[in-house]
């Protein structure tokens, strides 16, 4: 397509992998949902922290776009609205620990590899393109899955308000999609 946005959109749209979120929404058991939450806790209890390392590694419009996205991830100054706090609330409602690192020993190699990759991108300036590209891909592909994760929570029985973590992501990530794809990645490429 010739634009950063168009190229990113083509890349994420090309993924035709089976949707885990649809399985969770329609068929998963409570035990499967809880295992999913355990795996997600490795990242989501510190959500945004690794991507925030990109802020001092950027400048101009790219930096401003990342700060805007991260501010929302951190609840815009309200600690109860921080995405990590909402995920912790979900874990407690599902009868799981909200202690950061509490499930590292249960994490799969795939879970740890993903979290380690984000940390590596954030810690090394030379990987800032990978860091912002990862964030853009995440923001551009998460609205639908988060909607389905919320359906799974409501279907399987943790209190409905526990789905607030996923509902927040549906709303926020729809806004972040443009900011990450155009404002962040587009500005970095310029």
Task: Annotate each predicted stretch with a short phrase.
Residues 1-190:
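Non-heme di-metal
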């Amino acid at each position: 397509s010739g634009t950063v946005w168009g190229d990113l959109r083509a890349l994420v749209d090309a993924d035709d992998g089976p949707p885990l979120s649809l399985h969770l929404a329609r068929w998963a058991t409570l035990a499967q949902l809880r295992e999913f939450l355990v795996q997600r806790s490795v990242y989501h209890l510190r959500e945004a922290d690794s991507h925030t390392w990109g802020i001092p590694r950027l400048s101009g419009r790219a930096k401003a776009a990342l700060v805007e996205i991260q501010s929302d991830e951190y609840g815009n100054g309200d600690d109860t609205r921080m995405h990590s706090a909402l995920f912790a609330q979900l874990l407690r409602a599902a009868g799981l620990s909200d202690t950061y690192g509490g499930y590292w020993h249960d994490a799969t190699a795939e879970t740890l590899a993903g979290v380690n990759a984000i940390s590596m991108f954030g810690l090394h300036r030379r990987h800032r393109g990978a860091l912002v590209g990862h964030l853009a891909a995440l923001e551009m592909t998460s609205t639908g899955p988060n909607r389905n994760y919320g359906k799974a929570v409501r279907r399987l029985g943790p209190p409905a308000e526990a789905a607030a973590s996923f509902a927040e992501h549906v709303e926020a990530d729809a806004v972040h999609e443009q900011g990450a794809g155009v404002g962040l990645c587009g500005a970095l490429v310029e």
